[in-house]
Structures are given as C-alpha cells and as structure tokens.
Amino acid sequence: GSDGCGSGCEGGYYRVTPFAENSISLEAPETDEDFYECAVAFGTFISDLADYPAETLHETIPNFHNTADRYRIFHETLERAKADPQLAPRVDEAADMIAFALEREAEAGRLQAMRDSGELPTRVTHNDTKLNNVLLDADTRKLMYVIDLDTVMPGLSLYDYGDCVRFGASTAAEDEKDLSKVGLDLHLFEVFTKGFAKGCRDLTPKEAEMLPLGVKTITLEL
C-alpha cells in the first residue's frame, strides 16, 4: 500500500531477509560433516558477536536458562502436588524421576552461579541451537546462514553448546517414549565439540572446561 505496508500487514512489523538460494536445513545430521558444520556455525555465531554488548539485548524469555530458578519452581509445584489429593498419587508414581532430578540440583545450578560471579562470561547467544536453524549449501554442505533469531539473548556459550549436543547427538528422537532408546552418541559428541571449538575461537579456559556440564544442565532443564 501507499504506507509501505502490504495488504496482510495488519499494523504489525515484519523482518524481511534475502532468500538463501540452494540452501537446505536438516532435522538430523546425515553425516559427521553435517554435524561438524552446524557446530562451527553456532560457535562462529557466538564468536563473531563477542564484542557486542550482550546486556543491551532484550530478554525475550526472562530467566530462560536460569536453572536454579527452574528448580525453585519445581519445588513449589511439587509441594502443591503433594498436597492435592488428585495429584499426590502421580507424585508417588514419579518418585524415582523426582529423586533423580533432586539429586542433581546442586550441580545443575553451578553454571548460573559461575555466571553470576563472573567466572563465566555472559555472551550473545542463539538459544535455539537445533540443526534446522542452520542453512547449509545444498551442494557443498558448508555453512550459509544461522537463522531463527527471535531468541537471541544474553546467555552462556555452554547453553548453546549443550542444547545442540542434546538434540543432535542423541540416539533417539526428541519425542521418543521408550527411554531405553535414549542415550548420547559419544562419537557425535566429539564431532560437535571439535566443530564448536573451531567456530567459537575465543572460548575461555573455564568455558572449555565446563562444556560437558552444559550438556547435562540443558538436559536436566528439559
């Protein structure tokens, strides 16, 4: 229209980006090289934005990876469920899983504590590091773009790393109901770690040391 807005605008704002010709995205890695390239992509994303003031970014989802706060909510919900006659039996049924989560509470809050103390740097992070958020060249299978930027917020590099390993190196689909099929492919774990370290060139020694805890923490959050 004359106001520069198309007929379907409805008064909102739209972000327009160039169409990535000859690009593909993957729901799961088809080769080790695919997973490696995605790791390089997300590591490079963090590294390239290392000098951007992360604190100026709007938090689309406040406390998104504040694991200690998630445990606080978990405790409150658990107490309410125990006091509810209809929900209390379900608490008993899930006793083993509840115990599993509670036994790991101290470790799960460690990264947030290290961030709060400044031991781990707050960075610009993607916060949705699934493989399908990387566009690869269909012919060369090399990185073209990192997409889906609506959750870019201040965070820890370890969360981006951990979320993609959790998703991409799993031995089962995200919605698999048979938990006996769910595990971590250590070979893909190694492939991704090498690619991420190559892309995120300025990881601090402490960040590198804590990478495995990033995977455990994100898995517990979910």
Report the location of each language-model feature.
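Protein kinase-like catalytic domain
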Residues: 46-53, 197
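Short beta-strand micro-motifs within the conserved protein kinase catalytic domain, predominantly
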Residues: 1-10
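All-alpha amphipathic helical-bundle segments outside canonical DNA-binding/catalytic cores
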Residues: 203-215
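ATP-dependent phospho-/nucleotidyl transfer catalytic cores
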Residues: 5, 20-38, 51-126, 131, ...
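Conserved short submotifs of the Hanks-type protein kinase catalytic core
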Residues: 10-23
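Short amphipathic C-terminal alpha-helix that caps PH/PH-like domains
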Residues: 38-45
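Catalytic activation segment of kinase domains across protein kinase-like and atypical kinase folds
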Residues: 132-173
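Active-site activation/catalytic loop segments of kinase-like enzymes and analogous catalytic loops
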Residues: 158-201, 217-222
